Amino acid sequence: MSVVISDAWRQRFGGTARLYGEKALQLFADAHICVVGIGGVGSWAAEALARTGIGAITLIDMDDVCVTNTNRQIHALRDNVGLAKAEVMAERIRQINPECRVTVVDDFVTPDNVAQYMSVGYSYVIDAIDSVRPKAALIAYCRRNKIPLVTTGGAGGQIDPTQIQVTDLAKTIQDPLAAKLRERLKSDFGVVKNSKGKLGVDCVFSTEALVYPQSDGTVCAMKATAEGPKRMDCASGFGAATMVTATFGFVAVSHALKKMMAKAARQG
């Protein structure tokens, strides 16, 4: 059943309709999109979804806001430190659009619970997990069950958002997280390339050579390898910039919306 677009909704998202068209406005209002991982990439993806008029958004994460998230996460404000990221982001979405149906799942996706959390019938899933095994489990499940998904590679260690693009996961470069993810998909879930050398998984990544932090406080550009740092944690690993992490999230949302519109056009 289609969502009835209210006058208030139309006021908020008239600019969306003038850009994408009236049919797309209804498509977005009817959509239910899940963001898994509400951090440096996922928080910005959730923001973009809310401000585009997506009717239902599910946020999955069990992490809390940390003061060290300040450089890259939209919900990392002084008064939010120590609060659950998904809950804080959900309240922000309700402030953006009180009519958005927001669901919070206070948990981390694992190989054991991925089927439970992906059984909702999402219009699209945006994977912003930064740990390899749960990320692989989510991708493998969605791929096997034909749930539309876009994944994101590592967003740390980069300063140039103009080098971000979307390709098949098999084709990424300069991305240790994506490289490790390919290995885990193959070894743990039997996901291998097809005859065209593709995995059939859309991935947001950057062609930029990574900047690695050094123990003496300097930084150094090195060729990315699967053995390099893979995460942006609170104490070590890659540094990060909002300009890059946010763009990863925005590109993921843009790609998902484009795919949704193309599918709707094919179905008439």
Swiss-Prot record:
A GO BP entry: cyclic threonylcarbamoyladenosine biosynthetic process
EC numbers: 6.1.-.-
Effect of a null allele: Cells lacking this gene have a normal growth phenotype, but are unable to survive in a competitive growth situation with the wild-type strain. They display only the t(6)A but not the ct(6)A modification in tRNAs, and have lower decoding efficiency than wild-type. They show no defects in motility or antibiotic sensitivity. In growth competition experiments, a tcdA mutant shows reduced fitness compared to wild-type, but outcompetes a csdA mutant.
GO molecular function: ATP binding; potassium ion binding; protein homodimerization activity; sodium ion binding; tRNA threonylcarbamoyladenosine dehydratase; ubiquitin-like modifier activating enzyme activity
Compartment(s): Membrane
Topology within the bilayer: Single-pass membrane protein
Transmembrane segments: 237-257
GO cellular component: membrane
Any Pfam family the entry gives: ThiF
Gene3D superfamilies, A to Z: NAD(P)-binding Rossmann-like Domain
Its biological purpose: Catalyzes the ATP-dependent dehydration of threonylcarbamoyladenosine at position 37 (t(6)A37) to form cyclic t(6)A37 (ct(6)A37) in tRNAs that read codons beginning with adenine. TcdA is also part of a sulfur transfer pathway; is able to accept sulfur from CsdA directly in vitro, but CsdE might act as the sulfur donor in vivo.
Note: ct(6)A is involved in promoting decoding efficiency. It is an unstable modification that can be easily hydrolyzed and converted to t(6)A during nucleoside preparation by conventional methods. This explains why it was described as t(6)A37 in earlier studies.
Family the entry assigns: Belongs to the HesA/MoeB/ThiF family.
The name this protein goes by in its record: tRNA threonylcarbamoyladenosine dehydratase
Species in which this protein is naturally found: Escherichia coli (strain K12)
